[in-house]
């Protein structure tokens, strides 16, 4: 930057401030505008669609600049913060009229993606979490806070996967770190679109020590202190609304990793990325912003303690049994504003008169809500009733002090009620009498001069004035009117009388405005003392709101109360996918049973594409989640065990960020389940193995099924197009075949969407292609190829069962990896074995060569070497991932 640019006092002040916030847009207050200069102006003008101009445009090096009006600044701040930027607000700390020399300016707040408080109506039901992370050896200290609600929690995480799951669950936009966080982890966090902020220095804050006094783990205390330090440095205001830090353990809840939440569409639709079409969309009949946020938290963290779940169920059942009371409750809840965020604004000093009126209105509904709940013929809501403190002292204070239709500004007057303060009433009388005198003077001057359009007005520059059009100037008496301003078509004057009363009126207005602000500040500080009571109240109202929402949805869609058992018995009669059912509306939804005895581990699901296999699997997972958050479930009846984790491998998606293929993503997600699932987990595997060669895929699918069946024992739904795997029920006692029915009518495929016992007899793939509109000639060719293949591969169906039987005969030891089919190593070369395997199809004379599918035999040296390695392979000691890796090495060696 040229030295001349820095020489002016204002520019020196600007750079002194800007150097403290190099990574933020600096909004520099100049009069009624916030200005940006240099690179901030160039980039800000582009992002905010502002006109870029220059300061000192005639100079050798004009300064790029742009600005926004101070009254509209919040909108522009929100735009930048939503785009992931920080904004430093540099305010004038003294009245420019009274300043001696350069006006003093300071940054009063650094607004960041994780600290912004002003959320629009569309985000009222969404938390905005600021997170913090420190790394010590193999452990992570993790904390998060929502500055708008005061929530503050912390945990010690032991794995990278758990950390990433927490970050994605919280949907955090900003994380505070120190030097301990490794660069590779930082890079991984950045790929999630999270802004990384540094806070390396932490100094003791005695005034905030109470927030960490209940923490017993050093790592948790350290990370919370770092988070609080960052908040203090950036926000520069009271944090009285922050609640004491609560330590939590992710394992205390049903674990759902990011992929499972995505695949099950809990919060966002896969297709649109929006709320509609999700479980949240279905269940959200909440009437308050607090209730909406709590509902998301419950869906994100289902319970695993039977007594806690049943407590929620009892409350939902009670509300279901009392329709009229529930309707009255809903009506009162609609009148309750966002108590949590109103309390946050009070603490931050950003609350206005309108906010306080909303707080009063909300508090006035609490006695009515208490009465409705106390009238229920049950004691299940006793805890909530006891927490419904109407905070009457605060409501009465606001009612006495603040006008009903309060303005947004608290510095321009008009906020305090008449009669609240005697001195204020006197000032207002002086103002009103003065204005009455002005009106009388205007009438008198018109009569004296004979000028009918003479008027008395006011502006902040010239004060009160008498305005006369130029056509009537000759009618004014001489020597009594003092000219103040000349306009195009008029002149403005003053008189000695007007001047004397003007000073009295303006003095009264000034004193009145100043006193009003002082009174408002006292009211705000009194309300501030009740923040903890307001937060306790908000939590109770939020819980009541979510429970009534469950009751409404359960009644509207005929949900039933699930019976929770400690056994592994799972029985759902006429279960439904709740979201699909809602989307279908009046169309008939085909319900299905899901039954698995304690000894049954795997349901192997076959059936054509588009028949509903994936929907059936998701349906079970959503039913489990709904049950464990305390809601009723979509079924005629339901008996469920309590699950500790849900794993899903549904859909085909490349990981573009990591550059990984669909198959690699599939294997990693499957491996995650195999490594971490327990006998109390629910596992959903959809079409495992479809991303690789046929025999490779089938080999892996069978090995995974056997591994889950023999060693994990988790309840598993496994859908597949490998019909050969259906023979596994002959050897795996805990596996049962089911299929989704379909039939042909007049050559057309009709999906029955009904899950029936046994394996599917056909996959109907060509029929589905026909439904997709593929060319007739292509479909005819596909049918011809299909017939030939079915004739040639009739022996394959016995392979899976015979391999499983062979393994059983060889007494596979518990806790060792399941065996692999030998054809996985060399798809076309028969290998001597005690177990019969599928032979490579050989075309008979006269048959048409199916060159698209036929695979050449391996007879070269590389193939022989692979064959020898296969013969010596210790299959009994290999995991499915070991097998996958070995197959990959062989494929590379064979040039595939």
From Swiss-Prot:
Q: Specify which residues bind ATP according to the UniProt entry for this protein.
A: 607-614
Q: For the region Disordered, give the residue spans.
A: 809-835
Lineage top rank: taxon: Bacteria
Gene Ontology CC, one term: cytosol
Against InterPro entries, the record matches this protein to: DNA_mismatch_repair_MutS, DNA_mismatch_repair_MutS-lik_N, DNA_mismatch_repair_MutS/MSH, DNA_mismatch_repair_MutS_C, DNA_mismatch_repair_MutS_clamp, DNA_mismatch_repair_MutS_core, DNA_mismatch_repair_MutS_N, DNA_mismatch_repair_MutS_sf
Question: Can you provide one Gene Ontology molecular function annotated for this UniProt record?
Answer: ATP binding
Q: Which UniProt keywords apply?
A: ATP-binding, DNA damage, DNA repair, DNA-binding, Nucleotide-binding
Q: What SUPFAM superfamilies does its record include?
A: DNA repair protein MutS, domain I, DNA repair protein MutS, domain II, DNA repair protein MutS, domain III, P-loop containing nucleoside triphosphate hydrolases
**GO biological process annotations for this chain's record?**
mismatch repair
An example Pfam family from this entry, by short name, is MutS_I
Identify its protein family: Belongs to the DNA mismatch repair MutS family.
Explain the purpose of this protein. This protein is involved in the repair of mismatches in DNA. It is possible that it carries out the mismatch recognition step. This protein has a weak ATPase activity.
HAMAP family per the record? Answer: MutS
**Protein name stated in the entry:** DNA mismatch repair protein MutS
Specify the taxonomic lineage: Bacteria, Bacillati, Bacillota, Bacilli, Lactobacillales
The gene for this chain is: mutS
